[in-house]
């Protein structure tokens, strides 16, 4: 064996030019096991160097003779030399790229629905059930797949039996199949505004935060689900889902947000988890209505809200009803005119409610008592707020002609000239 190693060490001297380069690629000079020496015999005797001609074959013949006479190594006849490359094309790709190729999701035609579409394959999470240190040979590595200490002693590296390893692999496969079966189960969802739309459907509370905070007292409602498209150079018209949701706890804290993703459920999750980080606190009068009438315009959407007594209910746009229930407003009238774009409607509603002026703020600004006249109390005023500073002596001036913009529809309703077919309809509280 030592003679063979010395002979191979002389390869740079014996071999020159193209032949030396070829021999250098055929064998590793660090170690020469039995199978490698057998391969050398076949190469030097009758194989790959025959095409180089007979002019420079004398050094090769000497080397072959040295290997055959001085190395007596017996090896089974079934052993073969095989080239091994640990770095291949598949090691360059990520798992997502490999799955796209396996599921035929990379073509632009497949994205656009062109061609005959067979039954769609589903992606499996092969990392589910995997533990660091687990392999096909069942080695037990302390600190990775088994505890480091057992009964007060440090465990050593061991190996499972063949039966135990087969049981572990079967449990892993069963766990993946159960997860896929669980994902296919359809849960009957709550009915929203109508049977064929996502509007008004509850998504439950947002997911817990990274620091352990929970939002069990919050609820999430879907306001709008839309398909949006963007033009890309590779895929053409690419589709994604845009979701608008609102969250609230029914005690004045509420917010809204938008989530966008290619998958609908991912968009729901993004939107509800983002909305809980953009909350508004809405002041409520006696925890059931707004403090005063509000009229606002946001872009091309006009919203007019009116304060109502207890028991009146919510007579508004269905999206406003959903948001008011999340806030905790129980009695209010609202009318929407102009554009009814859902995003503009939601933004305008939150802007108007968050900018309303409470009775205490009005009393401090005017320096006067704020009183309320109720029908059940007659002409007796009820003081609802008093200024914290000095009380002003002169009363608030009253204009002869109040600067109020009248709506012709409201005027006709007040004078009895207009009667809606929905006027006596009572909504069921949900």
UniProtKB/Swiss-Prot annotation:
Location(s) in or outside the cell: Mitochondrion
A GO cellular component annotation in the UniProt record: mitochondrial inner membrane
Record-level GO BP terms: mitochondrial translation; translation
Pfam short name (any one): Ribosomal_uS5m_N
Family annotation (SUPFAM superfamilies): dsRNA-binding domain-like, Ribosomal protein S5 domain 2-like
Entry annotated with the keyword Cell membrane: no
Keyword Secreted in record: no
Keyword vocabulary terms for this entry: Mitochondrion, Ribonucleoprotein, Ribosomal protein
Molecular function (Gene Ontology), one example: RNA binding
Domain S5 DRBM: 218-282
Subunit structure: Component of the mitochondrial small ribosomal subunit (mt-SSU). Mature mammalian 55S mitochondrial ribosomes consist of a small (28S) and a large (39S) subunit. The 28S small subunit contains a 12S ribosomal RNA (12S mt-rRNA) and 30 different proteins. The 39S large subunit contains a 16S rRNA (16S mt-rRNA), a copy of mitochondrial valine transfer RNA (mt-tRNA(Val)), which plays an integral structural role, and 52 different proteins.
Family: Belongs to the universal ribosomal protein uS5 family.
Stated name of the protein: Small ribosomal subunit protein uS5m
Organism: Homo sapiens
Taxonomic classification: Eukaryota, Metazoa, Chordata, Craniata, Vertebrata
Recorded name of the encoding gene: MRPS5
């Amino acid at each position: 064996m030592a003679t063979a190693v010395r002979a191979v060490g002389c390869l740079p001297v014996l071999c020159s030019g193209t032949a030396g380069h070829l021999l250098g690629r055929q064998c590793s000079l660090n170690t020469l096991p039995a199978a490698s020496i057998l391969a050398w015999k076949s190469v030097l005797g009758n194989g790959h160097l025959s095409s180089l001609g007979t002019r420079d074959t004398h050094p090769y013949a000497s080397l072959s003779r040295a290997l055959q006479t001085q190395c007596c190594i017996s090896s089974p006849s079934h052993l073969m030399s095989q080239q091994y490359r640990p770095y291949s094309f598949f090691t360059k790709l990520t798992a997502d790229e490999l799955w796209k190729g396996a599921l035929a999701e990379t073509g632009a035609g497949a994205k656009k629905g062109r061609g005959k579409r067979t039954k769609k394959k589903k992606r499996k999470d092969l990392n589910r059930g995997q533990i660091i240190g687990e392999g096909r040979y069942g080695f037990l590595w302390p600190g990775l797949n088994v505890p480091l200490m057992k009964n007060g002693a440090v465990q050593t590296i061991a190996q499972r039996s063949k039966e135990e390893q087969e049981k572990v692999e079967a449990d892993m496969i069963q766990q993946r199949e159960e997860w896929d079966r669980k994902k296919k189960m359809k849960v009957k969802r709550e009915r929203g505004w109508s049977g064929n739309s996502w509007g008004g459907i509850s998504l439950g509370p947002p997911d817990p935060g990274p620091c352990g905070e929970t939002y069990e007292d919050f609820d999430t409602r879907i306001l709008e689900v839309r398909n949006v498209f963007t033009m890309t150079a590779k895929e053409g018209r690419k589709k994604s889902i845009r979701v608008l949701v609102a969250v609230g706890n029914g005690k004045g804290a509420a917010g809204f947000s938008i989530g966008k993703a290619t998958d609908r459920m991912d968009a729901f999750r993004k939107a509800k988890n983002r909305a809980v980080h953009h909350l508004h606190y809405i002041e409520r009068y006696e925890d059931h209505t707004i403090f005063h009438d509000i009229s606002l315009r946001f872009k091309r959407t006009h919203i007019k809200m009116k304060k109502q007594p207890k028991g009146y209910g919510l007579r508004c746009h269905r999206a406003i009803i959903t948001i008011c229930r999340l806030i905790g407003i129980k009695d209010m009238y609202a009318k929407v005119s102009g554009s009814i774009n859902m995003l503009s409607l939601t933004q305008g509603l939150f802007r108007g409610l968050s900018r309303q002026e409470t009775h205490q703020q009005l009393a401090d600004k005017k320096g006067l008592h704020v009183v309320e006249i109720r029908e059940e109390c007659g002409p007796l005023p009820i003081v609802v707020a008093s200024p914290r500073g000095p009380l002003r002596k002169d009363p608030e001036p009253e204009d002869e002609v109040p600067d109020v913009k009248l709506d012709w529809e409201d005027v006709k309703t007040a004078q009895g000239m207009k009667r809606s077919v929905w006027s006596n309809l009572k909504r069921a509280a949900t």
